[in-house]
Amino acid sequence: MKFDSRVMLNSANNNSPQHPVSAPSDINMNGYNRKLPQKRGYEMPKYSDPKKKMCKERIPQPKNTVAMLNELRHGLIYKLESQTGPVHAPLFTISVEVDGQKYLGQGRSKKVARIEAAATALRSFIQFKDGAVLSPLKPAGNLDFTSDEHLENGIENLSSSKMFEIIQTMLTEKLSNPTSLEQPTFCMSQNVSKSAITVDGQKKVPDKGPVMLLYELFNDVNFECINIDGAQNNCRFKMTVTINEKKFDGTGPSKKTAKNAAAKAALASLCNISYSPMVVPQKNVPLPIDDKSSSMELPQIHADTIGRLVLEKFMEVIKGQEAYSRRKVLAGIVMTENMNFCEAKVISVSTGTKCVSGEHMSVNGAVLNDSHAEIVSRRCLLKYLYAQLDLQCNQATAYQSIFVRNTDGQYPYKLKSGVHFHLYINTAPCGDARIFSPHENDTGVDKHPNRKARGQLRTKIESGEGTIPVKSSDGIQTWDGVLQGQRLLTMSCSDKIARWNIVGIQGSLLSSIIEPVYLHSIVLGSLLHPEHMYRAVCGRIEKSIQGLPPPYHLNKPRLALVTSAEPRNQAKAPNFGINWTIGDTELEVVNSLTGRTIGGQVSRITKQAFFVKYGFLMANLPGILVRKVTTDYGQTKANVKDYQIAKLELFSAFKREDLGSWLKKPIEQDEFGLAE
């Protein structure tokens, strides 16, 4: 029997006691016909059984140390021992008694202190393989459990027998360090997101900014702007962050940039967290040839140390001659022994961006053809290598040299084991390493790796900046052609660094005395693009290089970018450059256009100067079998057969890759003799 709502309405209006009406059970008190979900002819998802919803299978979450301890020991009581510190930052101490022994834990909240007390108790009767961390109280974020990478985020369905190993790999350093309880402000906060560091030890770029991450990791973080240099339109800010009385500096064109740089330096030093573009695995950036288990990245703290040492040395040597402090490119070479950066030495410092003018070419090797900073720094290193071989000429000083006798090798001398050289440049070297847009796909994979512009040999332009492909040049350079007005072209710095990674940085003359010396790392102050930089310095010929005589090989230096990147300098490049080598009493200022010092003298790092030093070594160095030196400089270089073979194989590799032909200076430049 159907019920008509009009009956109820009529009866309500009549208020007649003779017509009592009782509403059915499926009608609410407002008079609307709303059937229960069970009586409807169809089902709606939102009316699903609530009991079934509660029974939905859940993914098991990791247990913290309190839960672990409660499973192993029942009836434990946690007591609040004390509360110290200010109101806004209290420090709680909680104890738990297990098997008659009391264990303490401290934290910024009672919950954290209880977890630490439980962890201390667990460590007393469970033997761990290594020291380790607490498992997180909650997942770091929304996780994709279908992904193979979900284990890195700390969520894993493990049995209780394996949970102890998880505790070991996830405890904070504070628990493994007894003194940490005395210094709670230096310990990491307990709500740190684990997404910045993976469980397997491999680093990836954090998904948070350095300042935010630093505040999450440490409780006591203080930033301070301590210095502002430069004019209003080109100022430089210096920020310092203090963490547990340790200071870390950062510089930048704005306070925000400087603050980020300081935070990056602190994270790299204290947590080994790097924001370097080299952290992200690149498609075309394979591992170094000498270490297949490591990445192409130099540790960030080492890169920052190298950059800081070079900058400090530059400021030191320029004192008193501030007029020559103007520069666009700064370079330097740092030497380490056994990778001990605490005792690293700055071998050379240089500035410069120009090449010699064609009218100032020298037939006596008395001018510097290329005054670009990185090229000059390498020539300063040559000066240092000659000085170190000089020490071998005297038995009383031989032990001070970085070289040792190579009794069982084909070369009389070799570097001591563990000696490494690191090149710093404040920007990417000119040429192939700098042919990219820094704001387009900054660190992504190159979408056009086969584009014709990629990897091309390029030349510097006389009396100018920038480079052009060698295919656009006039080919062979002649002395009379240059004097008549043809531009004198010099190979780009990217190409020369690629050459050093085949034949070494010791030059052709020293190659008859010592084994090849290679750069261990290259650190840039700005404009580091992993793929472009790797391709420029070694990647473009790695598939085509062949036939190198041992011990010559393709060297793959580690790459890094400093945290305090240098801003783009729009000022006009000066026509001079400076150079300094360890042991020099003062710096040398060279006019880049003439290739001579500003006083018109011959520079101390010219071909002529090195040929004289080479002649002295050949006459006095112990262990030299053939001491006769050809009076012609070019012929002496040609007599170093293995070096020449390696160099020709390099040129052939570029040709096989269709990257152009290596452009040489007029041959007359090397046709000079050894001074009597």
From Swiss-Prot:
Keywords: Hydrolase, Metal-binding, mRNA processing, Repeat, Zinc. Residues 1-51 are annotated as: Disordered. GO terms for biological process: adenosine to inosine editing; adult behavior; adult locomotory behavior; locomotor rhythm; locomotory behavior; male courtship behavior; mRNA modification; mRNA processing. Residues 348-672 form the A to I editase domain. Pfam families: A_deamin, dsrm. One of its GO terms (cellular component) is cytoplasm. Transmembrane segments: none annotated. InterPro entries: A_deamin, dsRBD_dom. This is Double-stranded RNA-specific editase Adar. It comes from Drosophila melanogaster. The gene is Adar.
